[in-house]
């Protein structure tokens, strides 16, 4: 069995690699680790608004990108390479699948909506 990434997945990796190289250098990682929040809210907002990564595997019917766990793993791999500090794992890897599995249609429509994502981003700025 041979496994190869698709062109779209290669594009995601290249894009993530470039973006994270810009925002998660050694100084940024150290500053985030030393902060009370453990991440830089401005960077988290930028990642969420520009790259839309927290919505990577939210189904399109809820306003997400509708991609799968392979694409999510590509992002996590690149974040690990750069020691990127953010609430990404908690939101995209834990909360989203939990809502998709356990939530009812009404809660999914509310909590997976991109407008709600902005609320979550704002919450991440407070300790």
What are these regions (language model features)?
Residues 1-8:
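Intrinsic disorder at enzyme termini
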Residues 9, 20:
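Conserved S/T- and glycine-rich ATP-binding loop of Class I adenylate-forming
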Residues 21-126:
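Glycine-rich flavin
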């Amino acid at each position: 069995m041979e496994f190869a990434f698709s062109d779209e997945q290669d594009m995601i990796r290249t894009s993530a690699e470039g973006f994270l190289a810009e925002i998660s250098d050694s100084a940024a990682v150290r500053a985030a680790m030393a902060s009370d929040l453990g991440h830089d809210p401005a960077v988290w907002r930028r990642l969420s608004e520009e790259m839309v990564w927290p919505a990577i595997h939210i189904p399109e019917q809820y306003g997400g990108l509708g991609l799968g766990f392979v694409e999510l793993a590509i992002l996590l791999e690149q974040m690990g390479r750069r020691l990127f500090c953010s609430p990404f794992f908690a939101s995209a890897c834990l909360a989203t699948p939990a809502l998709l599995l356990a939530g009812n249609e009404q809660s999914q429509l509310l909590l997976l909506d991109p407008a709600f994502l902005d609320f979550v981003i704002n919450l991440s700025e407070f300790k």
